[in-house]
Design a protein with these regions (language model features):
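Non-heme Fe(II) oxygenase catalytic core, chiefly the N-lobe of the double-stranded beta-helix
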Residues: 1-243, 249-278
């Protein structure tokens, strides 16, 4: 039996049933999975039992896994894998919901990751969902006067943005050198689908290039308020063994904090080498 792709909502997201990335997939199955990511933006491959090194190998089906910037979050024998936990090592085991504000991965880099793969290792009994926003749909729905204000603008993305509301891991000197400030277009075109999306990141955008803080903050706040509407969202309820893949070029996401923080939530994450947004 081959892999079956099933939509999970009308907004975005699908699940793939019947594939085992550990034992391998055929070229046609790989192409079907890749196309499902392009078509649905978020793809959940169910029932995957993958070690960190197997996760890296599976990730290579969709692109080139990249070594994670922050050394403290890497798995030693698989540096492409970072640990996303509600007990970050840098906090000495103190509970924390990481990434609970809307964002897209890696936008503080000149070539942000194309895809992120997140594998469920340990889940709370209930809650701990991940929510996603379809940024194609956001751009399409923007009122013409607001869309006209955004056309041609670029935003400055920083690892430590003055507007960031989330906990951010401290960088080493070497890591700071590897993550200088960058700027990206606020509307980008997806190289595979040819579609345009609103490319914003509340965690990392510091200001609109060439604008003063007051004017920049006002427009960004307006865009964020519009983008955060439930009509653009899909909420993923994790199951053991889920491998969720999303496209950072046309989505935002956040972790949900509606669960008992005494229960561990541990994920293994791989991001794929990116490209300059255009």
């Amino acid at each position: 039996m081959g892999i079956e792709i099933r939509p999970l909502s009308d907004v975005m997201a699908a699940e793939a049933v019947g594939g085992d990335l550990k034992t391998g997939v055929s070229p046609s199955e790989r192409d079907a999975l890749s196309q499902a990511i392009t078509d649905h933006l978020v793809l959940c491959i169910r029932g995957q039992d993958l070690s960190p090194t197997e996760l890296v190998e599976a990730s290579s089906l969709f692109g080139e896994p990249k070594t994670f910037v922050l050394r403290n979050d890497r798995i030693e024998d698989a540096p492409e894998v970072s640990i996303v936990s509600n007990r970050p090592p840098l906090l000495g085991g103190k509970p924390l919901v990481q990434a609970k504000h809307w964002h897209t991965d890696d936008s503080y880099l000149a070539e942000p990751a194309t895809l992120t793969l997140l594998h469920a290792v340990t889940l709370p009994v209930t809650g701990g969902d991940t929510e996603f926003i379809n940024c194609y749909a956001v751009l399409t729905a923007l009122p013409p006067n607001l869309r006209g204000r955004v056309d041609g603008l670029r935003a400055v993305h920083k690892y430590l943005s003055r507007r960031n509301e989330s906990w951010v891991a401290k960088r080493s000197g070497e890591e700071e050198d590897e993550t200088p400030d960058v700027d990206h277009p606020m509307i980008r075109t997806h190289p595979l689908s040819g579609r345009m999306s609103l490319y914003i990141n509340p965690n990392r955008i510091d200001h609109i290039l060439g604008w003063d803080e007051e004017g920049s903050d006002a427009l960004l706040d307006t865009l964020y308020e519009f983008a955060f509407q439930p009509r653009f969202q899909y909420r993923h309820n994790w199951q053991p063994g889920d491998l969720v893949i999303w496209d950072n070029r046309c989505t935002m996401h956040r972790a949900n904090a509606d669960y008992d923080l005494t229960q561990p939530r541990v994920m293994h994450r791989v991001m794929l080498e990116g490209e300059i947004p255009e």
